Structures are given as C-alpha cells and as structure tokens.
Amino acid sequence: MTEPKFKTVFVFLDTDKYCSPFDMLVAVDAFPDSTIFKYENVTGEDAARIVFDALFPRGPEGAKHTKIFINGSNFDMVAEVVAATQKCMMSAPWGNSIIVDPRGAYSTAASAVAKTLGMALGKGLGSLEGKNVTVLAGTGPVGQIAAKLYASEKANVTIT
C-alpha cells in the first residue's frame, strides 16, 4: 500500500474585513499546487474552531503539509487569534506550522533589524548590545516591532 501524498494547504486567518491577497499570492507562487482556505473577520473564538477542525483530518503526516497563517492590522486581535491557535494545538499530539505576520510588520521589522545587525558585525562594530538605535516613524506597526526586536538585542532604542 502506498503512502498518501498530501497537498500543501494554507489556512489563512485574518482579523480584518478583507484578507490581504499579498501573502496568499506569495504562498501560491512558492507552492503552485497548494490550496488556500481563507477566513476573514476572525476572532479568537473563530480561530479555535477553525484550527481544531484543521488539526485532525490529515493526521500527523498531513499536518506537516498544513500551515496556519495569521494576519490582520490590529495587533491585539492578532494576538488573541495566536493565543487561541496555540491553545488549540495543545489538544493534539502533533500540530500545524503557524506563521504570524500581521500586515507584514513582523517580517519587515525582522529584516530591518537583521540587516542592521549584519552591517554592524560586518563593519567590526560587534552586536547591538549597548548601541544607540533610533527607529524613525516608529509609532506604526513595523516601527513598534522593530523597536521591540532592537530592545531584545539589548540596544538603547529611541522612537521618533
């Protein structure tokens, strides 16, 4: 008997009224044979039901091919969906991959911090610990996350 072949499935949970096509297009380009299920206006309660239903039908092997992508412009609502998703994952002996990137803020901020750190190391300046870092226009989503990431590197952070 041959092993079942699982198709890659992305379950997009978006807290906004409309799910942004940006990440769905990136997913389809990276995995052309994938399937995307999108859910909009998702709350923590909704997420628990959706994720629970996505956990079990494919078993542990199929779970490796099922990704949960959490998105939205409201960080608090996204955090609620993430918490509900993580709690739901505890109910199974396996879990799905979870990707969290509210409107690209996490990936953009992480890229900026990684680039800064790489430049500092490349110039022989060492780590960011104790260095002064200014995040320009840092009150938006990307700036807020970048400031937290710089602080986690023990940099002295100023937000303008």
Located regions from the model:
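A glycine-rich, Thr/Ser-enriched phosphate-binding loop motif common to dinucleotide/cofactor-binding enzymes
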Residues: 99-118
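N-terminal ligand-binding/catalytic initiation module
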Residues: 1-94
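Glycine/charged-rich beta-loop-alpha catalytic/anionic-binding loops adjacent to active sites
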Residues: 91-99, 129
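Short, surface-exposed connector motifs at secondary-structure boundaries
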Residues: 63-65, 94-95, 151-158
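Glycine-rich phosphate/diphosphate-binding loop of Rossmann-like nucleotide-binding domains
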Residues: 119-160
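Short, well-ordered amphipathic alpha-helices
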Residues: 83-86, 113-121
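Extended hydrophobic secondary-structure segments that form protein cores and membrane-embedded regions
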Residues: 68, 99-102, 132-137
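Gly/Ser/Thr-rich loops at beta-strand to alpha-helix junctions
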Residues: 17, 73-78, 104-108, 138-143
